[in-house]
Amino acid sequence: MIPYRQLVRMSHLAARFVGGADVHVVDPLVDLRNVFEQTDQLKIALECRNLTVDVEKVKNEYDEWFETYQKWKQADKESISQLKKELRAKKDGLLNALALPNLVHHAGKKQTPLLKPSKHAQYLAQQGLMRIDKQNHVVHLVGYPVVVQKMIREQLVDLFPGCQPISPSYFARAAILEALNIDQSTCIPFTDDSSHFPLTYLVGNSLPAITSPFLKTSFGEKNEWPISVQCTGASYTEKKNQVDLGNARQRMKHCALWMSKSAEELEGIINDANVRVGAYLDEGLDLEVKVREVRGSELKNYESQAFVVENRGLSLSRISRIGDYVSKRLNIQYSGSPATEKSEKSDGFVQMVYVETDIDRILARLVDDLIEGKEPPKYIRDAIKKSF
């Protein structure tokens, strides 16, 4: 059975049907019958992620909830109150179903390469270019690393000229994290210490941040497709054991999101992103990188497929195929032409691809190369000279 902690997490996403004090933020698609029509694929998605779930029990509980939901939608004033109580009594049926991960489009078979330890932290600290705040698990840079960091940020933005720059909020409600099926224990909770403040997290530039502006959005026919946006800046996670550029709780990242009307179009977007990011890191920064399709056990709950661009076992960039898993939960749709005698109505939930590149990890590997005697590209050397 799905762990209870996951059921509790989904209560914010399904606040409308659960009751209690949770804030109603999101209206996810609750007709999940098509998920259970693909039982074999669902079992594969669970097994490859090492999740033990009684699929039949989840399905039966959900069917009972959905049957009550359909009655509630059509109920008259006399019976609607009683049916609402029944919905809340059977809420586990919905919460269990919402806790299920995305189906798997394709998974790789290559083992995760051995991670080569980085020496950048000790080197930069000795040079007086980095200070490690062990209490808050963050690092502070000065001097040329800041120049290189800024340069990489600008170049990554230029790498995707078709992506519209946005400045999303650094905060996300619990319902947004649940819609993405992200483990909240990896995020930093935020509060103003008032009793009525809703459960909120500091996420910075991330998938929750870049998708939140489109919550409950319906794109019209006049939009140019695919719709693509990007943002860059600090990203935040909970504390880790190691504090350096690769593991600090505050790291500089570049994020890009594509939304398409066609699942078939995602393949081209993914291939293009793999080529652009891989070529930039390899040819632009002279880093030895390899693109690897991740195994099923490495997939995040919202991913159906993912590729990582790695340098000596360290992931520098991740390209995620999401499909319509997130858009159905955040209610992000597109509307098109109405139905005619010759064609069906053209509307649905958008298909997504998400690319996240860790700028601080790139900087760490550039410093590692420098320690080993490898010179950085000339334009980086020139930029460093100008900064002095």
Predicted regions and their residues:
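N-terminal alpha-helical targeting/anchoring segments
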Residues: 2-131
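TRNA-recognition modules of translation machinery and tRNA-sensing kinases, especially anticodon-binding
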Residues: 34, 64-67, 110, 115-388
